[in-house]
Amino acid sequence: MFIASAKLLVAALLTAGCALARAADLYVICNAHVSLRPAEVRDLFLGEKQFAGAVKLVPVDNGAAQTMFLGKVLQMNLAKYSTTWTKKSFRDGLNPPLVAGSDAEALAMVKRTPGACSYVTTLAGVDVVVVSKQ
């Protein structure tokens, strides 16, 4: 079992490197039991990657940062993302990611759910390990 203060892994630090992007950084975070490479983030949130070793992955969308995440990471809009998951649900029997309403809720879900990964716009007060900076 893990404790609530377990370290979160930052699977990717995604910024465009310009002044505007710095005002809206995006961090992909995972539960301490998840080993995920930045290149696997897209596959995770599109249902193509379901396990990291023996750990069942649980993607968690952050409603507050979803538009930014979809544009920067998945390079699609909300309509296309929803359509993708509707098709995947019928075709493959997969459920779309859970949805958190804010950074704080996403962090809490990742801390308490083994296999969970999400994304946030701030890391204030969070003990993390940066795996990659892009």
Where are the regions a protein language model picked out?
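Bacterial N-terminal signal peptides that target proteins for export
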Residues: M1-V10
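Sec/Tat signal peptide C-region and signal peptidase I cleavage site
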Residues: G17-A23
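Flexible loop/hinge segments at secondary-structure junctions
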Residues: A23-Q134
